[in-house]
Curated annotation (Swiss-Prot):
Name of this protein: Transcription factor Ken 1
Organism ancestry: Eukaryota, Metazoa, Ecdysozoa, Arthropoda, Hexapoda
Organism name: Culex quinquefasciatus
Gene: ken1
Biased composition (Polar residues): 145-157, 286-299
Compositional bias segments (type: Low complexity): 430-444
Entry's localization field: Nucleus
Function: Transcription factor required for terminalia development. Negative regulator of the JAK/STAT pathway: represses JAK/STAT-dependent expression of ventral veins lacking (vvl) in the posterior spiracles.
GO biological process terms held by the UniProt record: female analia development; female genitalia development; male analia development; male genitalia development; regulation of DNA-templated transcription; regulation of transcription by RNA polymerase II
Amino acid sequence: MCSKRELRMLMLHYSKHGECILQEIGAAFRGEHATDLLLICDGKETVRAHKLVLAAASPLIRMILEETPVLDGVTTVYFPEVQVSYFRLLLDFLYSGQVYVRSVEEYHHLQDLLALLQIKASIWKNSDGSGEGEPRKSEPLVDINRNTEGITGSSVVHQHPSRRRRSKSQDSLSGDSASGGGGTGSQAGTPKKVSVKSERHSAGSSVDGDGDRDREENLEYLDEVEEAIIKSNNNHPLHPHQHHLVAGSGGHHHHHHHHHHHRQLHQIKTRSRRSDPSANRRRSSSDPVNLSIVKQQQDVDSDDANIDVETIGTATTKTLLPPRYLDPFRTKRKAAAYYIHPADAEALKPMDHEGLLHNSPDNYVVTPHRKRRPGFHNSPAQNPPFVPSYLDDLRARSKCFLSAPPTYLPELRPGSPTSVRHAEIAAGLSNNNNSSSNNNNNNNRIRPPSADNKLAVAPFVYPWPTAALAGLPGGPSDLLGLPYVHGGGPNAETSPADLLQQMKNFENSQAELSARASAAGGGGGGSGGNGSGSGGVASGGGGGSMGGNTAVREYRCEYCGKTFGMSWNLKTHLRVHTGEKPFACRLCVAMFKQKAHLLKHLCSVHRNIINAPEAGGRYTCCFCSLVFETLQELVRHLSGHHNNLLLSKNLHE
């Protein structure tokens, strides 16, 4: 800081003001601090930037920000057909003042992006305006790096109205070094990078002879550099391609035609006499193209707030947006960006298929498993009661009906010698022998229909609903086990009263069979009784292979439909669904569904207690002082004498 007193006032001069501002802006861009502009490119890739920086360079961004109300401080602009890599190059160029492009294709895309954002060509093109004021003290560094991949030549040709020199023999330039007004040259044969220093003077109000002489020397020097590069790269094929840069002096604009060789890098640096020596530093790159911002001298009548839109010379402009996006913003040059404000952050995120799953604990259904962790209780609400299906009973008891439908039964054909009368079937149902209930009996076996006899069609019988069948005595399983009986011919009709009488007769016969089987088995229980409380249902039926008078009882689980032959097996199984754990370990308060699991737990987990080293290999009861020689004796002792201590309901006693 330095202070100066002038007209009784103090002026503070911030000598490094611009440098500090640029450093802060660069740090904010690299760290994405205080970003208020979100750019969404192709593939939903995002880039964050600052409105102030982009609005200062792009009239399109400034117009978007002026027309869009700011709600949350962040504005989102969509560029659906612009790759994010090109936008990063543009941001590096706007924030740092220069950018290195590695291919000609990227350079062209960057040019198109500059044109899309309506960025003036004077910002990045080297042009000198003629001013009427005093000469400028210093001018910044201007780097024009040309990538030669796909472009013929890397030289710069200045077309001057009065003079143009390109007559140098290649033989004379093979050993000479090119030198110019700045006293610095580059050899023609060896280097791939040619650095040129030239001295420029700002044009004043009048053009003198010294300025013309210096300009002519610069043109001659550039011609020598061009021919030196052509000499050093004469083996590379040429591809005609031109780029136009706007340059002028004394109010005239001259077009410079650039011819580039394949895979040849050429850099021309133009510096002023009073430029800072620190500006000599350059960043190295394998194949760069460098664009640098040039400070333009503003005209007196120019208005900074009104910036005209200019195109970039004759460079090829590719259509980056579809025509439907060009309607909202139509200026001197048609270019626009589809934007939405404010941004919907949820719409930008990709579809998350895993997020569709509800992770609520209520949606986790625990399947029955015999091995559970100690203390785990399964909620009965998560296990709906099992709804039994009587189709299995129908298949088991009426296998003969599966071979042919009732309309194809030989008993229904009139005049058949093997037909069975209704009276005989009723007598067979009331008979006490077991052969009437056996489906495999040869006397009642139904044979398949023959081809010589005509098929008889049985009359339609109204199907009984499930609720009506369940309300009838005897249970639905017995009704489904009732075989189809028809007493008349094929044209006879059966009344509901006859069907009810047949059902009652079948029910009485089944009751007599069950009573006789229970009496023979020593009071094994009645048919259809409750076998396990509310969790299981016990049912009885005739046993074909169990003997003459032995009834087979089965206990069905209402939750999963499993059947068991003994009630205690069903009772133990129901603990899987209800989560009941009636057995508990007093040593570690672990709970179990079965006593066998608790005894196994005591003999394995607490083996150091029941089989202590000081016991001499014998087993000690953990509840009393008795000692046993074998583990089986200890288990028998725990299960018998200390059975109450194994129950969880007596855990607190």
